[in-house]
Amino acid sequence: MNPIVKSFEYGQHTVTLETGVIARQADAAVLASMGDTTVLVTVVGKKEAEAGRDFFPLTVNYQEKTYAAGKIPGGFFKREGRPSEDETLIARLIDRPIRPLFPNGFTNEVQVIITVVSVDPQIEPDIISMIGTSAALAISGIPFSGPLGAARVGYINGEYVLNPTVTQLANSQLNLVVAGTEGAVLMVESEAQALPEEVMLGSVVYGHDQQQVVIKAIAEFKAEAGKPAWNWTAPVANEALVAQVKELAEVGLAQAYQIQVKQERYAQVAVVKAAAKEALLAANPEVDLREVDGLLGSLEKKVVRGRIIRGEPRIDGREPDMVRALSVLAGVLPRTHGSALFTRGETQALVTCTLGTERDAQKIDSIMGERTNRFMLHYNFPPYSVGETGMVGSPKRREIGHGKLAWRGINAVMPSAEEFPYSVRVVSEITESNGSSSMASVCGTSLALMDAGVPIKTSVAGIAMGLVKEGDNFVVLSDILGDEDHLGDMDFKVAGTRDGVTALQMDIKIEGITKEIMEIALQQAYGARVHILNVMDQAIGSHRDDISDHAPRITTIKINPEKIRDVIGKGGAVIRALTEETGTTIELEDDGTVKIASSNGEATKEAIRRIEEITSEVEVGRIYNGKVIRIVDFGAFVNILPGKDGLVHISQISDERVANVSDHLELNQEVTVKVMEVDRQGRVRLSIKEAQTKEAAAE
């Protein structure tokens, strides 16, 4: 075994790429390290494509092994299970920039598996996973237009920081990941603290400039370790068939794409395609209908793109910078804590907000350590939203990714735990979809949070931008339709406030996207965002003054930290009885903070009263109402506070001489007592007759 190793400095860290020792039966295997964070990336591709396949079956699997962090998995089976949300998101992060680098017409199955085998808690594994994937594909021999570079960019004290550590990220106003080739940015994923557009654009350019060292190093690594390139050639176009398809369908498709209603347009497109295929079959029964479908799709794309480049109206009749008609409603559901219905053209999101206690927060145990997430946002995309049937169940990768994007857009304006001590779960149900449903979720979430009384800093809106570029001519599109997303060259999603950007996601399918184009897209997105915010603010301009009557109200009190054990009780008996008998949820913190949650105000008051009783100190000279709990020859023990008993000596029961305690007192009898003394050992001496004397004097 002769390892081939390439090391280079990248920001604050040393990156090492190694091949030739591990997983030698894969087409390529690279052990990639950044500091002590190490991933094994393997690539396997099938040499032959399945006959008739018209898509590229690329699979990216990213898996974090708990042994990488020196942990044993939880659960009964004590082994890793289905991918976590973090693993799914990183798999998508890797997939998105590499997919457009495979050549058109390449339909061989390719699988990339990234396994995290060692992790430094200060160095997240996503960037080195992207670098390792790029290196493995580069040396595999599989057709791939790499190398690809990747960088994380932070923004701390007005300065960009390359690949910040986890500690540095906690103080950063920006967390941006950018990936690209030597000459082009292909993918951006970020969240930010409402930063100006120029800062966001600068971070993309900075990250792309800095990652050139990665691209150069992988090229050198490939020169030394690369396998022979596959003998693959792109399929040759059947020019005669292309001409026939164009003649039969071009005019019909152009007319169909003047229909503005999505379902009607799709129906007419299907009619045109069916007629073309029928005519081709009549002329040649041996014609390959799969090839015809591919050519019809290409023609469809050409027709739509040509109209846009020529300056003609878009599919639904809009100008490039126009936003579709908006409908904004808040408080649409009676029993939810907050709700909104946001409609933009043929895209609609029904968004709900639910408030819970700290106990309802999401607890995440990953290889990077444990963390608690008080704000959750879940995105659902049922098949009926696009007029289809399909499976309903666990969220798919796309749903997880869109939910996280919307979460990033909103997180910057969420209140702190001190400002709003609730856990918050938002669910966005996409009830109609024709493009930009994740950005509709951002808008709907902002509205639902305000309706629920969550004191977010300001409204947030999102917009999806697109691009059509032919040579030096290009058109930037605002609020793209699903078809424009599919047929265009860029999907550029921007969420933010009036003051700046909170989330940015960009996927570019072509090279040649310049800084100028990105700048135009950001400025056009700003105008669209402000327009949407103006409409949203007409529906609900600020958060409600109070939370819903159906939401739990959290009341916070402070107790002596030394009294926490008294509130909990032996084996949790006291706090369990408190919650069951009052119907409240009670949470205790080590500093003595007690949070009582209930939608019933009287129940909260009762819980507070009982906690104050439990934690209060016995005061000498004070009168208490107590209950006799034990009778002895020399007196009776009386409970005056939860967990606090005192002795009424036989001489303190009455002014008269008492021969037998049982003649005057019985078990569970309620009596009024005065505290006479608390000795150094905490023993309490009580008197019934002194209490009676004091009461008589008061009368």
UniProtKB/Swiss-Prot annotation:
Q: State where Mg(2+) binds.
A: D485, D491
Q: Report the principal subcellular site.
A: cytoplasm
Q: Name one GO molecular function term.
A: polyribonucleotide nucleotidyltransferase activity
Query: A Pfam family for this UniProt protein?
Result: S1
Q: Name the Gene3D superfamilies on file.
A: GHMP Kinase, N-terminal domain (3.30.230.70), K Homology domain, type 1 (3.30.1370.10), Nucleic acid-binding proteins (2.40.50.140)
**Ranges of residues in domain KH:** 552-611
What CDD domains does the entry give?
KH-I_PNPase, RNase_PH_PNPase_1, RNase_PH_PNPase_2, S1_PNPase
Its UniProt entry gives the catalysed reaction(s) as: RNA(n+1) + phosphate = RNA(n) + a ribonucleoside 5'-diphosphate
Q: Which organism is it from?
A: Shewanella sp. (strain MR-4)
Coiled-coil segments: none
Single biological process term from Gene Ontology: RNA processing
Q: What cofactor requirement does the entry state?
A: Mg(2+)
**Keyword Secreted assigned:** no
Q: What is this protein called?
A: Polyribonucleotide nucleotidyltransferase
Q: Which GO terms describe its cellular component?
A: cytosol
